[in-house]
Amino acid sequence: MSIPETQKAIIFYESNGKLEHKDIPVPKPKPNELLINVKYSGVCHTDLHAWHGDWPLPTKLPLVGGHEGAGVVVGMGENVKGWKIGDYAGIKWLNGSCMACEYCELGNESNCPHADLSGYTHDGSFQEYATADAVQAAHIPQGTDLAEVAPILCAGITVYKALKSANLRAGHWAAISGAAGGLGSLAVQYAKAMGYRVLGIDGGPGKEELFTSLGGEVFIDFTKEKDIVSAVVKATNGGAHGIINVSVSEAAIEASTRYCRANGTVVLVGLPAGAKCSSDVFNHVVKSISIVGSYVGNRADTREALDFFARGLVKSPIKVVGLSSLPEIYEKMEKGQIAGRYVVDTSK
């Protein structure tokens, strides 16, 4: 298979710098890496943070962002096992980990102190060819629609793991804060497929229609409802058993601690820059609620999340545009104008 020397990519050279669509060299895989011809990449809110550089963790610069890349293996290092040329492969947020520390030993690779992050510390999937650690790269079944599966590689895995972290049972209420966004639209479907009753909170044109089309049961529009807490408690007859906070609103996170049912779980997923999670201690203790953080997922979570997709239980509500349109997508994202998930075609 012929591999070119150069490729098209979106790259920036400083935080908040110009997003340049230009030719850059095709990377060479290290002994433990795959070289993947990225066909499509999802666009995540994390990519926006990587560009802004507003998280405590510094990015590499210059940087090619993106961490939801779906494509075809076209090359590999000499130490790679379990892959062959032509396999479908996915690039995840966790590009690689040491596999030797206590966290990796327990399957918590995302907490590895030496984790390498796609589109953050490792050039990501907003390019035609990208490298990924062969151990952490996702195995995608042949014949899968690579555009539709792309968002599963971060958004899908992330919300699936978060729902597992909520310790819910069939028939329990799962509240999704930010239910019509890229992560939320997938969380609604995973929750439904796992047997939960789903309440969604979001606001803006088309959000309720999308939520309902995905199988959600109760929708609360925060732009119209004056008392979100009371509305959730009433709709769920006592509060949600589990809340998945994919919204990037500090106020929404605080509210979720108040509409959580007694003995319920608040799961923090979205990462608004500089935000804090505030919970009234008396209410927290007397209601015996748990607040947990959930950060992407491990290889088993990846396999399980992809299986839901492969069986048709979860679909990606996507809009495909060219990679060159990435600056416009970021602008829409900053204005909260995105329903579902944008996916970029790296060839355009």
Swiss-Prot record:
PROSITE patterns: ADH_ZINC (PS00059). Keywords: Acetylation, Cytoplasm, Isopeptide bond, Metal-binding, NAD, Oxidoreductase, Phosphoprotein, Ubl conjugation, Zinc. Induction: Repressed by glucose and expressed during anaerobic fermentation. Its cofactor is Zn(2+). The modification Phosphothreonine is found at residue 223. Preferentially oxidative, glucose-repressed isozyme that catalyzes the conversion of ethanol to acetaldehyde. Main enzyme involved in ethanol consumption. Acts on a variety of primary unbranched aliphatic alcohols. Also produces ethanol from glucose, albeit less than ADH1. The modification N-acetylserine is found at residue 2. The modification Phosphoserine is found at residues 213, 279, 316. GO terms for molecular function: alcohol dehydrogenase (NAD+) activity; butanol dehydrogenase (NAD+) activity; ethanol dehydrogenase (NAD+) activity; zinc ion binding. Present with 1620 molecules/cell in log phase SD medium. NAD(+) binds at residues 45-46, 49, 181-183, 202, 207, 222, 269, 294, 296, 341. This is Alcohol dehydrogenase 2. InterPro entries: ADH-like_C, ADH-like_N, ADH_Zn_CS, GroES-like_sf, NAD(P)-bd_dom_sf, PKS_ER. Belongs to the zinc-containing alcohol dehydrogenase family. Zn(2+) 1 binds at residues 44, 67-68, 154. The gene is ADH2. Zn(2+) 2 binds at residues 98, 101, 104, 112.
